[in-house]
């Protein structure tokens, strides 16, 4: 069976670094005519060749240790029966005294003709223009105050006609370029990443061990991607494959160049089940 037809597939991935623990739960069980977890079904957008995800739910838990009390952040992405992202819910939980506090917000995703519209609870609307393959070429994001940012995207296209994000460029209201990220895929074991925000520049290398690569059969985005500005503004689009496919192998280290402010190397370890 193709991967999207395999039922009850589960993968748990855990990584610990810098006092933060991530736990990622991916739930399979997609079938072409089934409803999502809430009993609702969103029609598959046209054309049917748009990229899809082989899961009905991705849940990422992040435990952040602090001097006060630990905060648990839960990120939940829900997909319809066609494998298209329909919503994201972010929740922060912490205990103060004997009382549990929770802060929750929801972001919705709607699909139109060659468009994906992502709206968060703060009223920010991001409209992505999609090419014929379903990948975004541009995005216009406007917040409640009327501030507008525009983004352009370019991709590396492999021999299987899959798109991998190569560049994102952000411009402000006045048309000035404010930030960008460029990813070089020349060596799939060592992705070179160039990042610039305003006048700050930072380069790093995302690596996977030579000869001992971990295949990304679950098709999950690299965890570090959504921590990098301006890609951090597009986490929902990344998990919806609106900004291309995830890397073919799981990244195990993110190593900054010596020209950056941070010299800290981030290490990722993974535990996977056998299903």
Regions from the PLM with identified roles:
Residues 1-15:
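N-terminal secretory signal peptides that target proteins for export/translocation
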Residues 9, 18-19, 124, 230:
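Generic hydrophobic-segment detector
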Residues 13-23:
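Sec-dependent N-terminal signal peptides
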Residues 36-275:
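Buried hydrophobic residues that stabilize the cores of well-folded domains
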């Amino acid at each position: 069976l193709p991967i999207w037809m395999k039922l009850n597939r589960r993968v748990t991935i855990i990584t610990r670094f810098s006092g933060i623990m991530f736990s990622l739960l991916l739930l399979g069980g997609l079938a072409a005519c089934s409803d999502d977890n809430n009993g609702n079904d969103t029609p598959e957008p046209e054309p049917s060749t748009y990229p899809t995800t082989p899961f009905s739910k991705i849940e990422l838990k992040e435990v952040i240790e602090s001097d006060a009390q630990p905060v648990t952040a839960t990120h939940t992405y829900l997909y319809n029966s066609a494998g298209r992202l329909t919503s994201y819910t972010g929740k922060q939980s912490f205990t103060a005294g004997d009382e549990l506090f929770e802060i929750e917000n929801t972001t919705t995703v709607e699909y139109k003709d060659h468009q994906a519209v992502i709206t968060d609870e703060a009223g920010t609307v991001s409209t992505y223009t999609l090419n014929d393959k379903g990948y975004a070429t541009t995005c216009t994001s406007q917040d409640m105050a009327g501030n507008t940012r525009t983004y352009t995207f370019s991709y590396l296209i492999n021999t299987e006609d899959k798109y991998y994000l190569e560049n994102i460029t952000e411009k402000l209201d006045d048309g000035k370029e404010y930030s960008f990220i460029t990813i070089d895929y020349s060596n799939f074991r060592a992705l070179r990443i160039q990042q610039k925000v305003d006048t700050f520049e930072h380069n790093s290398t995302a690596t996977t061990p030579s000869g001992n690569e971990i295949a990304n059969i679950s098709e999950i985005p690299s965890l570090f991607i959504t921590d990098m500005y301006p890609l951090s503004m597009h986490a929902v689009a990344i998990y919806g494959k609106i900004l291309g496919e995830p890397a073919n192998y799981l990244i195990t280290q993110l190593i900054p160049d010596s020209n950056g402010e941070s010299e800290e190397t981030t290490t990722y370890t993974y535990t996977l089940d056998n299903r």
